[in-house]
């Protein structure tokens, strides 16, 4: 016991933060998803977790922090080390370098320091605004407080965080550049007082979340007090497992329950008990042994004239209530020596007892029994809002029909209460605003200011659910499932079973078995392939919000594939009669085989030999007359060369005689490409080259454009290039540069003239062909001079009209007036003629437009038909390509 006591009071030394590993095994601090970075990150997380729980495990004598008290701390550590901690206010991820504040009341949620400061100021400002707008009836109002956004725990105004402290609150601005210390932690022992007020401090390293239960050893008694044992301070309340044996409230029986916490249950021992008056006997539980029957007492009182009017009771009935000092009902007149069986007379005065309203007295004469329940005296009353005054009976409340138009404390809805006294009740509507998580709406009563953050925490867990962490609602979309160190619980279905290498918990299908199949064939060999047996049903894929349909879908196992036929090589004899008859074959192939030699027997066609591999012969003979009946039949097409030679194969099967003449149609276009000729192959190939050229001519104009001019070749369809393109004899209209003079020249002269001017006739555009070859004469010059003089006069006249001053036009106006008199006036007939001409022009224009539209539509239809015909000809030419 001395050693135990010493253990209970031992002080634990401080644990230093874990040292980084050597340079041989560097651990990356990046967020990469690669395999090495993920393993290093997981390894570092394990080191941090082990270092935080090191002192606690030393004291707790456990190999892993698996107690229920540490589950919440492990969840905080998993989310913090994986970078999944998000601020509930701004829903942004909390980085290692961000100043933070954590609630120390109940939820231990982590927020950005700036966000919680802003949140606290908004809460206090809102309360101050409410206090200003609300009529203050209580001069001693409580001090304004602000609440934690998650657990709504209250904090005083002085508790607004001003500094960035670690989780345990000992160090200001904890280091953020040490990857071997938990973010926002000082790395030292927490030493915060534990919640059960045991007097001990937390032994974990500075950590998020609540402190674990006290692991120190203390002497403690069980619930019933019968057993004393040494227990952990955090779990010192225990049950010894024996019967409680504590005396119950009846002070007769003992508790028969197993050693338990709290008060003992009521005594349930049954027996026959009498009621309080002793007239009735009933079987009751011991805890209900004192009871009253429904009969009246009816015992004679001490006066001998009245009976007891009380119900069932214990003890004496007491004195007669009518004895002693007697008075009238209102209590103003007293009667001495009046017997208890004589009724006291009425005094005849006013009752004057205070009525239920508390202001007026009973106006009736002295009477027996209670006074009026309602005061009917008419008084002048004001309604609650003070707008209406009216004379009403005293017992009646006065309320007007006016609805309060003040805005409630939510600043969104009006009060709308009838006859409000100014103290408007809080808004009863639901806020209903969309929260920042974008998934839920605010369910709080309607309020001012920002809504509280969404209180729902989303659990991100591995496939087995053993490893998990919680994130605020709205931040789960970017989260990945944690890496679980537990082994996969899915049982393999292949024949190897437990011989497989175990793998860790995962989503989706299990990795395939890597062992060899080794299943034995009937021949005695074993399958050497990778395991291809059945695979167990896979876990569902990681989905944040699976639908009900997804949850009810049951994954099915994947059936395995059968082993292939035995691939082992063995020696088998040949079924033919060639040398080297044995051949190495697959064991599973039980059929007869042929060797690599061909049969070689001549076929009936006389052109080919049997191409079968070595096969069993019905008749063996080396002579050509006695051919084997088991050899193949020649189904090949004729492969002889035709005479005369052509590219078309003989359509007949292989035959010994000569091939028939080739009747295949051969498509050949004419020289100018205007039409296509079809010839029989035998007819076309027997002609000479000169006759072929002659037969291909279409006997029509060439229709090919000459290279040096815009005219077509006038020759009959001919092969090769068009002859003498520079000797074109077509007439061309030749003009001067001003297009005044024109003449007709022969095309070859026009080409020569263009060459003389230094331009190539091939490069001259069609609309400029022959323009500028004639020299301009005197008429062209005179016309040019006349046009220039007219243009000059017109310009001078316009300039003079612009320069005429506006003030010196009186005389000119007279001249213009005189000029205007010389102009003849138009008659009605002339106006009618002009109008008729205009109408006729409009009618002609409309008719022309209609004609153009009609014939244009017809032309488009004709063009479409022509293009279809051309397309059909092209398709036919593709079917029969030119040779």
Curated annotation (Swiss-Prot):
Query: What pathway does the annotation place this protein in?
Result: Protein modification; protein ubiquitination
Q: Disulphide bridges in this chain?
A: none
Question: What are the TM regions of this chain, as residue ranges?
Answer: 841-863
Q: Where is this region: Disordered?
A: 1-44, 798-824
The domain of life is: Eukaryota
For this UniProt record, give its keywords in alphabetical order, as a comma-separated list: Biological rhythms, Membrane, Metal-binding, Nucleus, Repeat, Transferase, Transmembrane, Transmembrane helix, Ubl conjugation pathway, Zinc, Zinc-finger
Q: Where are the zinc fingers (RING-type)?
A: 87-152
Q: Where does it live in the cell?
A: Nucleus; Membrane
List residue spans of NF-X1-type Zn fingers.
198-216, 250-269, 303-322, 357-377, 410-429, 437-456, 494-515, 523-568, 605-636, 646-664, 709-738
Its record classes its membrane topology as: Single-pass membrane protein
Record-linked InterPro entries:
NFX1_fam, Zinc_finger_PHD-type_CS, Znf_NFX1
Q: Which molecular function term from Gene Ontology is one that the record holds?
A: DNA-binding transcription factor activity
- What tissue specificity does the UniProt entry give? Constitutively expressed in mesophyll and guard cells.
Q: What induces it?
A: Circadian-regulation with a peak of expression at or before dawn. Not regulated by biotic and abiotic stresses, by light and nutrient conditions or upon treatment with elicitors, chemicals, abscisic acid or phytohormones.
User: Which residue windows does the record flag with biased composition (Polar residues)?
Assistant: 1-10
* One record GO biological process: rhythmic process
What exactly does this protein do? Probable transcriptional regulator. May mediate E2- or E3-dependent ubiquitination. Required to gate light sensitivity during the night. Regulates the speed of the clock by acting in the feedback loop between CCA1, LHY and APRR1/TOC1. Promotes the expression of CCA1 at night but not by days. This activational effect is enhanced by interaction with ADO1/ZTL. Association with ADO1/ZTL is not leading to the degradation of NFXL2. Confers sensitivity to osmotic stress such as high salinity. Prevents H(2)O(2) production and abscisic acid accumulation.
- Family that this chain belongs to: Belongs to the NFX1 family.
Q: What is this protein called?
A: NF-X1-type zinc finger protein NFXL2
Upper lineage: Eukaryota, Viridiplantae, Streptophyta, Embryophyta, Tracheophyta
């Amino acid at each position: 016991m001395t050693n135990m006591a010493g253990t209970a009071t031992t002080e634990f030394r401080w644990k230093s933060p874990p040292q980084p590993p050597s340079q041989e095994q560097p651990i990356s601090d990046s967020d990469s998803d690669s395999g090495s970075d993920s393993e290093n990150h997981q390894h570092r997380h394990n080191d941090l977790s082990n270092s935080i729980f090191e002192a606690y495990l030393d004291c707790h004598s456990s190999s892993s922090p698996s107690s229920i008290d540490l589950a919440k701390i492990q969840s905080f550590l998993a989310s913090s080390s994986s970078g999944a901690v998000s601020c509930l206010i701004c829903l942004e991820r909390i980085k290692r370098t961000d100043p933070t504040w954590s609630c120390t009341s109940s939820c231990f949620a982590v927020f950005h320091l700036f966000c919680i400061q802003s949140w606290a100021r908004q809460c206090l400002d809102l309360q101050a605004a409410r206090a200003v707008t609300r009529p203050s009836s209580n001069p001693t109002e409580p001090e304004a407080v602000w609440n934690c956004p998650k657990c709504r725990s209250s904090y005083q105004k002085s508790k607004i965080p001003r500094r960035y402290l670690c989780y345990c609150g000992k160090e200001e601005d904890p280091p953020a550049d040490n990857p071997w210390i938990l973010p926002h932690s000082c790395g030292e022992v927490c030493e915060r007082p534990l919640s059960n007020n045991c007097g001990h401090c937390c032994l974990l390293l500075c950590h998020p979340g609540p402190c674990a239960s006290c692991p120190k050893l203390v002497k403690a008694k069980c619930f019933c007090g019968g057993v004393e044992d040494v227990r952990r301070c955090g779990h010192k309340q225990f049950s010894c497992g024996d019967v409680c044996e504590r005396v119950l409230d009846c002070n007769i029986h003992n508790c028969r329950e197993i050693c338990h916490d709290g008060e003992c249950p009521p005594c349930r021992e049954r027996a026959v008990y009498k009621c309080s008056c002793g007239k009735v006997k009933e079987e009751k539980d011991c805890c209900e042994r004192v009871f009253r029957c429904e009969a009246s007492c009816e015992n004679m009182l001490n006066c001998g004239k009245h009976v007891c009017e009380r119900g069932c009771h214990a003890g004496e009935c007491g004195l007669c209530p009518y004895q002693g000092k007697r008075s009238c009902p209102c209590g103003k007149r007293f009667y001495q020596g009046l017997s208890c069986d004589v009724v006291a007379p009425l005094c005849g005065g006013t009752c004057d007892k205070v009525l239920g309203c508390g202001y007026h007295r009973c106006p009736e004469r002295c009477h027996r029994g209670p006074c009026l329940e309602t005061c009917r005296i008419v008084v002048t009353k004001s309604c609650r809002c003070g707008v209406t005054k009216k004379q009403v009976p005293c017992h009646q409340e006065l309320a007007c029909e006016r609805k309060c138009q003040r805005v409630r404390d939510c600043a969104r809805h009006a009060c709308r209460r009838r006859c409000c006294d100014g103290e408007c009740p809080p808004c009863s509507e639901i806020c209903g605003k969309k929260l920042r998580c974008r998934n839920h709406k605010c369910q709080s009563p309607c309020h001012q200011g920002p809504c509280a953050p969404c209180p729902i925490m989303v659990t991100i867990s591995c496939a087995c659910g053993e490893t998990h962490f919680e994130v605020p609602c709205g931040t789960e979309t970017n989260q990945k499932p944690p890496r679980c160190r537990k082994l996969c619980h899915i049982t393999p279905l292949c024949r190897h079973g437990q011989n497989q290498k175990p793998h860790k918990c995962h989503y989706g299908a299990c990795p395939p078995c890597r062992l060899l199949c080794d299943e034995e064939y009937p021949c005695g060999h074993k399958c050497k392939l990778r395991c291809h047996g059945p695979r167990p049903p896979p876990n569902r894929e990681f989905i944040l919000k699976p639908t009900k349909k997804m949850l009810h879908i049951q994954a099915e196992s994947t059936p395995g594939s059968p082993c292939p036929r035995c691939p082992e090589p063995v020696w088998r004899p040949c079924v033919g009669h060639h040398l080297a008859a044995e051949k190495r074959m697959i064991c599973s192939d039980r059929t007869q085989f042929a060797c690599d030699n061909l049969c070689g027997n001549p076929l009936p066609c006389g052109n080919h030999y049997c191409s079968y591999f070595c096969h069993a012969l019905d008749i063996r003979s080396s002579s050509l007359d006695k051919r084997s009946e088991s050899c193949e039949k020649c189904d090949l097409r004729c492969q002889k060369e035709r005479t005369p030679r052509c590219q078309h194969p003989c359509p007949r099967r292989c035959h010994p005689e000569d091939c028939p003449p080739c009747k295949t149609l051969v498509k050949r276009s004419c020289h100018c490409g205007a039409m296509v000729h079809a010839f029989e192959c035998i007819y076309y190939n027997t002609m000479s080259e000169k006759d072929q050229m002659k037969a291909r001519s279409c006997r029509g104009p060439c229709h090919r454009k000459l290279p040096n001019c815009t005219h077509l070749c006038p020759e009959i369809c001919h092969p090769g290039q068009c002859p003498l393109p520079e000797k074109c004899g077509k007439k061309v209209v030749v003009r001067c540069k001003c297009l005044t003079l024109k003449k007709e020249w022969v095309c070859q002269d026009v080409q020569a003239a263009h060459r003389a001017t230094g331009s190539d006739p091939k490069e001259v555009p069609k609309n400029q062909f022959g323009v500028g070859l004639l020299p301009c004469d005197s008429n062209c010059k005179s016309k040019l001079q006349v046009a220039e003089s007219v243009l000059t006069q017109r310009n001078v006249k316009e300039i003079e009209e612009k320069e005429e001053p506006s003030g010196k036009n009186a005389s000119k106006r007279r001249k213009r007036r005189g000029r205007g008199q010389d102009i003849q006036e138009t008659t009605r007939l002339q106006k009618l003629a002009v109008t008729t001409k205009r109408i006729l022009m409009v009618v002609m224009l409309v008719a022309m437009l209609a004609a153009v539209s009609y014939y244009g539509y017809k032309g488009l239809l004709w063009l479409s038909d022509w293009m279809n015909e051309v397309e059909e000809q092209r398709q036919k030419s593709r079917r029969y390509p030119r040779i």
